[in-house]
Structure formats: structure tokens, C-alpha cells
């Protein structure tokens, strides 16, 4: 099991949340905290956009899905879009199985997410 590293940065195009490692019940609160903080920053960002980069995530459990869903719902209320970046089955499969791909826009790269 790999420890979770998560943080966010405000870029010209969006607030980007970088996630690396395993997202499970023991690490999801850290993810949730960073997502909440990123949403707070995004409310004053010109594009009102949060991009969550999950490319370096090795395991993505249901607690992580719940954190993303909470972020999406809070963003919707605040008028801030939330987009995901994922390119491998460890992250995509749980999102697809739970049909969260119907509400999240998912892109293979951060660049693609920013261009949309």
C-alpha cells in the first residue's frame, strides 16, 4: 500500500488537485480536505474550475468516490466545475461501475481537461 500524497495549486487555467498513491478509507479524509480547499480557492478563480488529476493513483476505493462526489455536489452549488483526469483501470473502473462517469467529465490528461 502506497501512502497518499495530495495537494492543490492555483494555475492560470484552473485550480489543479494532484493526487498520488492509494485512496481508501484511511486516506480519503486527506483527499476530501484538499478538494474542499481547492473548491474554496476556485470560487474566486476566473474560470471557476477544479481539475482533479488522478493519473498517479494506484488504488481508488469507495471512500475516494464519495469524496469526489461530495466535491462535485459542493462545486455545483458554488457554480464551480469539477473535472477528472484519469487514464488507467485502477481509477476508471470504480468510476464506471458506479456510473459516476455519467456526471463527471473525465479526460486522459490535464491539458485535455483544461482545453474543454
What is each model feature region?
Residues 11, 89, 111:
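Residues that form or immediately flank small-molecule/cofactor binding pockets and catalytic motifs
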Residues 2-36, 56:
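STAS-typified acidic loop motif
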Residues 1-2, 116:
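Actinobacteria-biased recognition of intrinsically disordered, low-complexity terminal regions
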Residues 7, 85, 107:
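General small-molecule cofactor/ligand-binding pocket signal
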Residues 25-104:
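Amphipathic alpha-helical interaction surfaces in cytosolic regulatory modules
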Residues 38, 113-116:
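C-terminal alpha-helix
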Residues 104-109, 113:
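Short acidic-hydrophobic, aromatic-tinged amphipathic segments that line or gate anion-handling sites
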Residues 18, 99, 109:
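Residue-level signal for pocket-adjacent positions within structured domains
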Amino acid at each position: 500500500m502506497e501512502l497518499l500524497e495530495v495537494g492543490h495549486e492555483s494555475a492560470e487555467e484552473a485550480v489543479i488537485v494532484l493526487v498520488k498513491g492509494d485512496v481508501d478509507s484511511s486516506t480519503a479524509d486527506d483527499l476530501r480536505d484538499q478538494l474542499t480547499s481547492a473548491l474554496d480557492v476556485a470560487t474566486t478563480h476566473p474560470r471557476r474550475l477544479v481539475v482533479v488529476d488522478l493519473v498517479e493513483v494506484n488504488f481508488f476505493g469507495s471512500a475516494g468516490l464519495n469524496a469526489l462526489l461530495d466535491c462535485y455536489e459542493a462545486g455545483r452549488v458554488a457554480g464551480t466545475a469539477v473535472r477528472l483526469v484519469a487514464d488507467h483501470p485502477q481509477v476508471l473502473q470504480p468510476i464506471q461501475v458506479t456510473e459516476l462517469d455519467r456526471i463527471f467529465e473525465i479526460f486522459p490528461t490535464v491539458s485535455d481537461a483544461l482545453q474543454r
